[in-house]
Amino acid sequence: MIQTKSETITREFTTSAKNRGSYWITTFGCQMNKADSERMAGILQAMGYQKAKTELCADLVLYNTCTIRDNAEQKVYSYLGRQAIRKKSSPHLKLVVAGCVAQQEGESLLRRVPELDLVMGPQHANRLEDLLNQVDNGQQVVATEEHLILEDLTAARRDSNICAWVNVIYGCNERCTYCVVPSVRGKEQSREPKAIKLEIEDLAKKGFKEVTLLGQNIDAYGRDLPGISSSGRRENTLTDLLYFIHDINGINRIRFATSHPRYFTTRLIEACAELPKLCEHFHIPFQSGDNEVLKRMGRGYTIEKYRRIIDKIRELMPNSSISSDVIVAFPGEDESQFQNTLKIIREIGFDQVNTAAYSQRPNTPAASWAEQLPESVKIDRLKELNLLVEQTAKDKNTRYHNQIVEVLAEGINPKNQEQLMGRTRTNRLTFFSKIGPKKYSYNPGDLVKVKISEIRAFSLTGSPIQ
């Protein structure tokens, strides 16, 4: 059963679309940021801005930022420095910093880069029009206060017309000791199921074929929504949402990310096995293969629990692909604990792993711990990890050799104009000829049967067979 929050706020934009100049958005970081950028681009176009041909000729430049690692944050300051110099000769330029760096730094960003016009945290993305109107009135604006995220009826300007990101839950209530996300993205706010369904139905009408449901911890979806069944089970879970949206006509594939092992239930796995549109790919970060490290990270599960989740997925969906995230050189991690992480990667056999050496982030407990590891150890462990991850990914991809897979064509291969590129249901990037048997020509948006002839660690190449 699906229930909704009565206090949901919605808003339509009424600003006339007069020509306000051009805009450019640069996005750093995660899928959530990419989805936010698409939404903000839609707002700007509804206001009368047009996308610029290049960043250097834009009248409004917006950086949607990430602070999960220090190097991502420093890159933002490098970009801002160039725009600050440009603004001295182009005073009409509007300069905006959005996202997690904006939320973390707030007014201190204005002191560091006084040329900024607007600093806005991720909870304020849907307020962009109102905030820019304040800038037009001569104000320098900082919007980082905790805020109820508005349902935004303005159509996002999607980077693709085939695959779409759909935010279903904002924020994070976890307290991982290394992570800055809860302090910059705020508390969990689940969207109403009906609003999510309406957005996906609209995407289907526009010809989109695939949606990816997004959340920092997507399987925590609905914890803040009302609804308890007669059996005492919480309603409005991610599982309920998947059943609720599954039969929307026109949508061929459904994905979701990112999952937290603490909330990944057997019922969710069973639903994914039952519902044919759910793709056989699961992104479930494990972060460390050592229980003591997981405990110090504040992750709330053991590696044994993580293994049980993977075992259940492979029991019900043997051909599923599993991707993950891992951090090495966490404060106090010794060599044996690092080896436990490598052991898990070998034994589980991940299709892909996003890797990182631990990075101290402000306002996180682990940043102040005494057991920080030397940079040389971080570099060595990350290098060893990456070599293993690449070899494991290539080994996993061998199962596709000479196999026929379904690929959703997403666009032209930028390195080979004679090829299309897309993804399998298991999320393998695949390249194939635009021309099939009997000189049939395939186009983006087509579901194509492809026989795989070449494998690499992170991609496949083949030929259409139909």
From Swiss-Prot:
The Enzyme Commission number assigned here is 2.8.4.3
Pfam families per the UniProt record, alphabetical: Radical_SAM (PF04055), TRAM (PF01938), UPF0004 (PF00919)
Q: Which residues bind [4Fe-4S] cluster 1?
A: 30, 66, 100
Q: InterPro entries from the xrefs? A: Elp3/MiaA/NifB-like_rSAM (IPR006638), Methylthiotransferase (IPR005839), Methylthiotransferase_CS (IPR020612), Methylthiotransferase_N (IPR013848), Methylthiotransferase_N_sf (IPR038135), MiaB_methiolase (IPR006463), rSAM (IPR007197), TRAM_dom (IPR002792)
Reactions catalysed, semicolon-separated, are: N(6)-dimethylallyladenosine(37) in tRNA + (sulfur carrier)-SH + AH2 + 2 S-adenosyl-L-methionine = 2-methylsulfanyl-N(6)-dimethylallyladenosine(37) in tRNA + (sulfur carrier)-H + 5'-deoxyadenosine + L-methionine + A + S-adenosyl-L-homocysteine + 2 H(+)
**Which cofactors, by name?**
[4Fe-4S] cluster
Radical SAM core domain residues: 158-395
PROSITE patterns hit by this protein = MTTASE_N (PS51449), MTTASE_RADICAL (PS01278), RADICAL_SAM (PS51918), TRAM (PS50926)
Matching entries from SUPFAM superfamilies are given as: Radical SAM enzymes
Enzyme class, broadest EC rank: transferase
Location in or out of the cell:
Cytoplasm
**Single GO BP term:** tRNA methylthiolation
Cofactor details (free text)? Binds 2 [4Fe-4S] clusters. One cluster is coordinated with 3 cysteines and an exchangeable S-adenosyl-L-methionine.
The residue ranges of the MTTase N-terminal domain are: 21-137
Entry keywords, A to Z: 4Fe-4S, Cytoplasm, Iron, Iron-sulfur, Metal-binding, S-adenosyl-L-methionine, Transferase, tRNA processing
UniProt-annotated binding residues for [4Fe-4S] cluster 2? 172, 176, 179
CDD domains with a match to the protein in the record: Radical_SAM
What terms describe the molecular function in GO for this protein? 4 iron, 4 sulfur cluster binding; metal ion binding; methylthiotransferase activity
Record-stated family: Belongs to the methylthiotransferase family. MiaB subfamily.
Q: Which NCBIfam families match?
A: miaB-methiolase, MiaB/RimO family radical SAM methylthiotransferase
User: What does the subunit comment say?
Assistant: Monomer.
Q: What is this protein called?
A: tRNA-2-methylthio-N(6)-dimethylallyladenosine synthase
